[in-house]
């Protein structure tokens, strides 16, 4: 429900169509016990966009560029401790999560993607389909909670269509702490969030504020492991992964990995959808490992071969207490975590680092194909 005010203890998975505020466990417990909570509501920062997104760029690059252009325009992080109001009305919920799940990394309190009526309805219809799939699998409870969610979605769609309650929108006279305008025309190459582990100023390491274009690395950055997963990815990312593999196979005859690529799909239902739509086939074709819930691994993996790993849906490497990369590795990941020791720990002779990027960049960083200029990236995508 885009009108819901939600309080929770998770630093990520901010609601893409509602407003969600992270809180400590005690505050959440108080809200559950009393139905009320006292929280200071910070100012908002309005983010609008101009220009056009190039067809070979990924929305993840827009998210990173938003942070970089904000710092350039404002000279300081105006998102910190505030609410980010994203004005792209045509973002479906899956895409919107790519922005709102980066909220914590922008140091903001919360964020919301303003939605047009038609887009909100489409997001609700997608949600209904996925909930129905869960019901068909026998996942509803005795109180029919999942069926109740479909009823809520249908009622919300009715409210929008009738004009009784359109999609949530700011007041015409809304006031903002600051306004940031993101120029999409300036985003002409993939953007990387770099932990900058060797910065002489220790305070500038592991901050998420160092956003660099891929050309900064001049194709000289060796990637030891790639990871596609976490709350930053959705079904579309899995389809992009499948299509990139198909494109490379068509041009080169086969796909060979120069580094391990770990893939953790968002949900089991999405895995089923990918199977129905044919995208899972090529992932299976090149997978050296595929998860099997009937024969689970006995322990977390800490050593990897140069193959594609299809892991079970979940946080995987991003969680930090499940799988881990080898100490001292350079990891290219779609996740949100670049903190020291989270995804990869330091080795005695080399710092571990987790660079964050879009799904296409992560995939291509593990495959030995020519990737020395932007045109190569455009062709692969």
Give each language-model segment a name.
Residues 1, 109-255, 263-289, 303-307, ...:
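Accessory "access/gating" subregions that flank catalytic or transport cores
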Residues 1-33, 37-40:
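Long, structured ligand/cofactor-binding scaffold of large enzymes
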Residues 1-4, 9-11, 40-45, 78-83, ...:
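Short coil/turn connectors at secondary-structure junctions
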Residues 8, 48-50, 85-87, 224-229, ...:
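Short glycine-rich or small-residue beta-strand-to-loop segments that form or flank ligand, phosphate
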Residues 27-38, 62-76, 99-100, 206-216, ...:
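Structured alpha-helical segments in the cores of large, soluble enzyme domains
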Residues 34-74, 269, 273-275, 279-280:
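A structural-propensity feature for long, helix-poor, extended segments
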Residues 258, 268-359:
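Thiamine diphosphate
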Residues 372-381:
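Conserved small/polar residues in nucleotide/adenosyl-binding loops
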């Amino acid at each position: 429900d885009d009108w819901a005010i939600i309080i929770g203890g998770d630093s990520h998975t901010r609601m893409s169509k509602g407003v969600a505020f992270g809180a400590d466990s005690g505050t959440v417990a108080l809200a559950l016990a009393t139905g009320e909570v006292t929280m200071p509501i910070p100012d908002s920062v309005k983010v609008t966009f101009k220009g056009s997104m190039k067809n070979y760029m990924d929305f993840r690059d827009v998210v990173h560029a938003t942070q970089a252009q904000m710092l350039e325009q404002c000279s300081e992080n105006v998102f910190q401790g505030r609410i980010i109001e994203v004005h792209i009305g045509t973002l479906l919920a899956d895409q919107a999560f790519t922005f709102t799940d980066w909220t914590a990394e922008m140091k903001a309190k919360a964020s919301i993607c303003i939605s047009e009526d038609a887009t909100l309805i489409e997001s609700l219809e997608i949600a209904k389909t996925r909930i129905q799939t869960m019901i068909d699998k026998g996942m509803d409870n005795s109180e029919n909670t999942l069926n109740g969610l479909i009823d809520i979605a249908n009622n919300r769609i009715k409210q929008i269509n009738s004009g009784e309650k359109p999609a949530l929108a700011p007041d015409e006279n809304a006031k903002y702490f600051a306004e940031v305008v993101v120029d999409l025309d300036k985003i002409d190459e993939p953007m990387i969030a770099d932990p900058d582990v060797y910065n002489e100023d220790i305070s500038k390491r592991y901050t998420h504020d160092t956003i660099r274009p891929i050309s900064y690395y001049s194709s000289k950055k060796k990637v030891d492991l790639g990871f596609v997963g976490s709350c930053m990815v959705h079904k579309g990312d899995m389809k992009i992964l499948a299509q990139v593999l198909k494109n490379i196979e068509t041009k080169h005859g086969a796909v060979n990995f120069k580094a391990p690529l770990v893939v953790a799909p968002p949900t089991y239902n999405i895995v089923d959808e990918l199977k129905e739509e044919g995208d899972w086939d090529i992932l299976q074709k090149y997978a050296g490992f595929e998860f099997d819930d009937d024969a689970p691994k006995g322990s977390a993996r800490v050593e990897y071969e140069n193959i594609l790993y299809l892991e079970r849906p979940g946080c995987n490497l991003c969680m930090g207490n499940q799988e881990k990369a080898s100490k001292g590795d350079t990891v290219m990941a779609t996740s949100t975590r670049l903190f020291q020791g989270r995804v990869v720990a330091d080795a005695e002779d080399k710092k571990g680092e987790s660079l964050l990027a879009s799904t296409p960049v992560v995939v291509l960083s593990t495959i030995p194909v020519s990737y020395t200029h932007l045109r190569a990236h455009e062709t692969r995508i």
